[in-house]
Amino acid sequence: MNTQIEYKLLDARLAEQLPAYATPGAAGLDLRACIDLPLEIAPGQTTLIPTGIAIHIADPGLAAIILPRSGLGHKHGIVLGNLVGLIDSDYQGQLMVSCWNRGSVAYAVQPLERIAQLVIVPVVQAQFRQVDEFEASDRGVAGFGSTGRG
């Protein structure tokens, strides 16, 4: 699928490092920390980091999600403070990344370091219909852990 999304470059340093798919099979584009100096995130601390880019998806059938980079989370404990960022199709502001240090050691984010990834996803705005009872299903109301392990 080839979908065009408008973007604004808010930090000239990104001109040579625009978000791009690294491989033909890549789902996400890397977002960078557009900061001037290293930014230390202490254990347990959350900070909001600008990416230097704004997007306008425009198509109400699409949205974007911001996800953590697996290496930062696994090696350094740096994940998203809001776990997943949701960017609606009508949002036009700068993309910001909430970084949370869930680790036990401070981590210094470097200027233009890749800190998160952006994935474009389809959206369905479902119509809801109130009912008194649901049609029976195999699972019913069985909740957390009800399907077992393995």
Swiss-Prot record:
Q: Please name the top-level EC class of this enzyme.
A: hydrolase
- Catalytic activity of the protein: dUTP + H2O = dUMP + diphosphate + H(+)
What are the entry keywords? Hydrolase, Magnesium, Metal-binding, Nucleotide metabolism
Which EC number(s) are documented for this chain? 3.6.1.23
Q: Which Pfam families does its entry note?
A: dUTPase (PF00692)
| Co-factor(s) | Mg(2+)
Keyword Magnesium found: yes
Similarity-based family = Belongs to the dUTPase family.
Which PANTHER family does the record match to this protein?
DEOXYURIDINE 5'-TRIPHOSPHATE NUCLEOTIDOHYDROLASE
Protein name as annotated: Deoxyuridine 5'-triphosphate nucleotidohydrolase
